[in-house]
From Swiss-Prot:
GO BP of this protein: translation
Keyword field: Ribonucleoprotein, Ribosomal protein
UniProt xrefs under SUPFAM superfamilies: Prokaryotic ribosomal protein L17
Family: Belongs to the bacterial ribosomal protein bL17 family.
Cellular component, GO annotation: cytosolic large ribosomal subunit
Name of the encoding gene: rplQ
InterPro entries: Ribosomal_bL17, Ribosomal_bL17_CS, Ribosomal_bL17_sf
Pfam families found in the cross-reference section: Ribosomal_L17 (PF01196)
Highest taxon in the source lineage: Bacteria
Species this protein is from: Rhodococcus jostii (strain RHA1)
PANTHER family named in the record: LARGE RIBOSOMAL SUBUNIT PROTEIN BL17M (PTHR14413:SF16), RIBOSOMAL PROTEIN L17 (PTHR14413)
GO MF annotation: an example: structural constituent of ribosome
Assembly and oligomerization: Part of the 50S ribosomal subunit. Contacts protein L32.
Protein name in the entry: Large ribosomal subunit protein bL17
Length: 189
């Protein structure tokens, strides 16, 4: 015999919890985004995503499974006609939870749960563009390195000594500049 899950239920009883999630899912599919408590939003996410997965399949059997949960036929029609086909090429991740300010009165942590409206094709195109740019950048970089190596090869020993002297002079100036504020503070004391 299957044992019931342990722990608190939303609404107190199993039937009330089912009703709460059915109503939340109906509102989510009807409006696209809803504000609720953070714990209800986290519990609603897998529930709603399974319904969207049924809508993606689009068969009569899947429609009847969704109608067992969502009683509003207009919302079910919207789910199967618009939402399901919209996510046809997306594997999961149909909802997003955004935490908001706590509720006034009881200070309960609140969140917005919404259907993700961005297509994954745009993100894939951006990723492909970045990959192509990163592949083009290393191809251009070795050519620049060869130029630098050629210039370094042409430098004479005298030029190298002059460069070392310039570097030492710059280091001396920065050290003196760093000591200057300390000297001014000592004069003030």
């Amino acid at each position: 015999m299957p044992k019931p899950k342990k722990g608190a239920r939303f609404g107190g009883s199993a039937s009330h919890q089912k009703a709460i999630f059915a109503n939340l899912a109906t509102a989510l599919f009807e409006h696209g985004r809803i504000t609720t408590t953070e714990s209800k939003a986290k519990a609603l996410r897998p529930y709603a995503e399974k319904l969207v997965t049924h809508a993606k399949a689009g068969t009569l059997a899947h429609r009847r499974e969704v109608l067992k949960v969502i009683r509003n036929k207009d919302v079910v029609h919207t789910l199967f006609a618009e939402i399901g086909p919209f996510y046809a090429d997306r594997d999961g991740g149909y909802t997003r939870i955004i935490k908001t300010v706590p509720r006034k009165g009881d200070n309960a942590p609140m969140a917005i749960i919404e259907l993700v409206k961005e297509k994954t094709v745009t993100s894939e195109a951006d990723r492909a563009r970045r990959v192509k740019a990163s592949q083009d950048a290393p191809a251009a970089a070795p050519a620049e390195e060869n130029v630098v190596e050629a210039v370094e090869a042409e430098a004479t020993d005298a030029e190298v000594e002059n460069a070392d002297a310039v570097v030492e002079a710059i280091e001396d100036e920065t050290a003196t500049a760093a000591d200057a504020p300390e000297a001014e503070e000592a004069k003030k004391d």
